[in-house]
Amino acid sequence: MNKITLPIGMHDKLFKRARVTYEIERDISDFLMAQGFNRIDTPTLEHFEVFSDYVEPHHYHLFDKKGELLVLRPDVTSQIGRVIASTRVHTPTKFSYSGKVFHYQEELRGLANELSQAGIEIIGYPARKAVLEAIKTAKQSLDLAQVKSYQFEFSHAAILQTILESLALDSQEEAQLLDYIRKKNRTGLFEFTQTRSSEFDDFLQELPYLFGPSQQVLARARELVDNERILTALDDIEQVLQSLSGLLDQTTMDLGQVAAMPYYTGLTFKVFGDRVPDAFLSGGRYDQLFKRFGAAELTAIGWSLDIDSVYQAIHDDLPDEGGKEGDGR
């Protein structure tokens, strides 16, 4: 019966889960505002062009009564880009936010389609200062949420962008290549280089193995490529990691990390923990996003944290109170 069942990917939260996820969102939001971030709330419904020039299959679309195509927001960063371009907000500025975002996932994947997020955007500040502040506040937010074990993994969007631009693939070929990279399919990548040979052949064939301790990955990557733009991206990662040496005990890299959002242009990072299969925090630089809305390029970096995944990471350490077994914990 549709009266008592939920749409695909939607979930009720009860008792401890509802209380703790609320507390995580509240505490991180209060912390970020205390650190000088300006709170911003954006609408759940937007014109679909804010997020894409074409209809995306993983977005929730609907028509309003005037026939305008709208979308349930899949992320907040694009909305903030719209705000910067369409209002008189002065930069540099720093925003923090929390709220729901929506991604349509196939039913059999068992993933949530409604996600609770908290995040930040640092816009118009010197790049290196902004990167360090973003990563520092990400770490502090995870510590505040009492996540005991986690690790930062770094990459750089310019690496894959350089390869894709150089190869000039059609949309189907590009999607296939990214699928090979995302799945670390070495056979697929080898076969691809046999049909679309380029200066990146050695790098692409080895890409599924270019992950692990940062210095080892950097050293190996530099042996495989001599493209100036990619080498500059590797230098950028290394310089950031050197600046973070007193903040993060250990870092890893994955140069086959495919950015979750298309607007990333520079350093990207994800955070993984022991009890969560996917990254529960991700972010990066997106200096060119504002051009999409007719504004000038600005240095910008941000991150978003999946509150429900953080709850999953700390669940076993929480006191067993409020509610009974099987009641939505």
UniProtKB/Swiss-Prot annotation:
Cell compartment(s), UniProt: Cytoplasm
Keywords for the protein's UniProt record, in alphabetical order: Amino-acid biosynthesis, Cytoplasm, Histidine biosynthesis
InterPro entries: aa-tRNA-synth_II/BPL/LPL (IPR045864), HisRS-like_core (IPR041715), HisRS/HisZ (IPR004516), HisZ (IPR004517)
Pathway: Amino-acid biosynthesis; L-histidine biosynthesis; L-histidine from 5-phospho-alpha-D-ribose 1-diphosphate: step 1/9
Main location: cytoplasm
CDD domains: HisRS-like_core
GO biological process, one term: L-histidine biosynthetic process
This protein's record includes keyword S-adenosyl-L-methionine: no
GO-annotated molecular function: catalytic activity, acting on a protein; histidine-tRNA ligase activity; transferase activity
One annotated Gene Ontology cellular component of this protein: cytoplasm
Family matches, as Pfam families: tRNA-synt_His (PF13393)
Regions crossing the membrane: none
Function noted in UniProt: Required for the first step of histidine biosynthesis. May allow the feedback regulation of ATP phosphoribosyltransferase activity by histidine.
Miscellaneous remark of the record: This function is generally fulfilled by the C-terminal part of HisG, which is missing in some bacteria such as this one.
Family: Belongs to the class-II aminoacyl-tRNA synthetase family. HisZ subfamily.
Subunit annotation: Heteromultimer composed of HisG and HisZ subunits.
Protein name: ATP phosphoribosyltransferase regulatory subunit
Gene behind this protein: hisZ
